Amino acid sequence: MKKRKNIIAAVILLMCCVAASLKAEVRYATTSVTDIPFDMPRVALPDIPANTVCITDFGAVGDGGSLCTEAFAKAMQTLAAKGGGRLVVPAGIWLTGPIQFENCTELHLERGALLLFTSDFDAYPNVSTVYEGNTANKKMAPLWAYRKHDIAITGDGAVDAQGERWRPSKQGKFTANQWKELTSGQGIAHKGVWYPDAKQDDEAGKEGKPDFRRVLQRPVLLEFAECQRVLLQDVTLSNSPAWNTHPLKCEDVTIDHVTIRNPWYAQNGDGLDLESCNRCIIKNSTFDVGDDAICIKSGKDKEGRSWKMPCQNVIIEGCTVLHGHGGFVIGSEMSSGARNIYVYNCLFNGTDTGLRMKSTRGRGGVVEKIYVDKINMVNIAGEAFTFSLYYANKPVAGKQDGDTSSADAVPPVTEETPCFRDLHISNITCQGARRAVYFNGLPEMPLSDVVLENSLFVCDEGADMHYAKNITFKNVKIQQKRGERITMADVKNFKEK
């Protein structure tokens, strides 16, 4: 009897060990970065079961005209009933409404597959989400997940969200011929802005009033909110109604060899907005967009501060940015803060600005421990490195491009005061920019503790700094065409070595 009990105990122990070993087989994302300047935790990859279904099994037709929304919903529900798995989309044009992910599911787009999301406004239910840092009532994102775990989009296929059927377009972004061509088709021009649709449900529609619902409620292309273990790999995500890709309050996010595209004129056409996420690797991806390309965010103002969720533990490596308002950007919605961010070995080619950090009074939040290394920049329209705490607000008098009006009173430091400190920028090579460096902090909260080293800037103008302290330049070469190499006002403890 005693021997039998021992055998049973041994079997139970063995089963526990096997279960523990299976549970421990977590796969992690890899990075080529070896000297990460902070304690970076590993980033877990999704665990997708081996079950596989094909979208054609559910009646979908890839002819670009047959609506496949119901087929995608049935496929996801079928996988969910099996505990998860992979949904394969073969070559073809698959017209569909929004796709909602279930736990442990992977959407795999084979080469030649195009997900074409319908422009039917009513195909997208309204959802409570976050946009520009605050709670908002918007249309559901075409690619949508809320509080799911282990989800992925993979494959060499592409996604087109038909953003031109949602976005307004400002006349100032177009040449005369481009504007004429845009406004000659469907849509309506109203006060220097082209809108994709006129309002049809009242008399105002007959007078050419735009349908502002479509504009105000337009969704981002991809929103994964409060999800764990997310993977985007190899796919092309393009033509979003608003922002392109928006992981929100997620953990363990990997974006690898992804192409993110929006038209250069796309209103609010950001590429990647990583908001209040933890443990992320963004690598070997390409961005060509209409607004900021790779952007770190963490909520806006009082609501954002209440999250207490900084965007943190992020590696961005081996990425290329073409058109975009900024190559790597922090802000302006950063009220929960950001820290432990490492940007390494990237190329910015033809971007409006290279490194862009922005906020304003009222935001609050602390941004610190930001590391940027080995960035090559070519043909930058504005600044190679710009920092301003006057985003969308008037700067202190005389501190930006000739403003000579009287200065406002300096407010006290409160939780609403944004703080940027402990920035380390190294090995920057910029061949062509309007200005090398522009710093504009707040009188009550200067930009502080910045090290810029081993860098070369070939530009029209040099460095211009205001309201900053503890700034160190080490082996920084600035070859400007005009003006002084460095100009400063209200800068304390500047050192050059």
Please annotate each region the language model reported.
Residues 20-497:
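Extracellular/periplasmic carbohydrate-active domains that bind, remodel
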